[in-house]
């Protein structure tokens, strides 16, 4: 299986959601931004690298969320609660919009299926922050 990592970036009681532009099958849907872990790379290093590449900011992994979610027959998603440690997130080539969503607004966007199982725990995290 190929590990994909997603960043649940939290700031001021809100979660950052990113709307995909590619591929066509996922364009217009929302996700926790991130990407694939390269050979020889740790999951944490991959997440920090992917967020810098995709959003132009730096994050710090606070803790990994429980569970892994299958994406397809080849990829599996792990997600981490992250905080911003530098810069301001900006959409890059993979995303056309970013939104900060409070716990009562998490259902306002059309999340990709692998991200959905993480939402109840993230809602609880936001309510406690």
Protein language model features and the residues they cover:
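Generic C-terminal helix-cap and adjacent flexible tail
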Residues: 123-129
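Conserved Nudix-box catalytic region and its N-terminal flanking loop in Nudix hydrolases
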Residues: 14-53, 57
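HhH-family (HhH-GPD) DNA N-glycosylase catalytic core used in base-excision repair
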Residues: 52, 58, 62, 127
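Conserved N-terminal beta-strand and adjoining loop/helix that marks the start
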Residues: 1-16, 36
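Active-site-adjacent beta-strand/loop module that shapes the phosphate/pyrophosphate-binding cleft
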Residues: 58, 66-90, 99, 103, ...
């Amino acid at each position: 299986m190929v590990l994909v990592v997603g960043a649940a970036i939290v700031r001021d009681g809100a979660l950052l959601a990113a709307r995909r532009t590619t591929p066509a099958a996922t364009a217009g849907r929302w996700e926790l931004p991130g990407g694939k872990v390269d050979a020889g790379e740790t999951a944490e290093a991959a997440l920090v690298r992917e967020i810098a590449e995709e959003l132009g900011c730096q994050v710090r992994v606070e803790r990994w969320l429980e569970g892994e979610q299958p994406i397809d027959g080849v990829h599996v998603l792990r997600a981490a609660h992250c905080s911003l440690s530098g810069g301001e997130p900006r959409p890059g080539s993979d995303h056309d919009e970013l939104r900060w969503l409070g716990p009562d607004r998490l259902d306002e966007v059309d999340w990709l299926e692998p991200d959905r199982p993480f939402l109840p725990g993230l809602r609880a995290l936001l309510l406690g922050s």
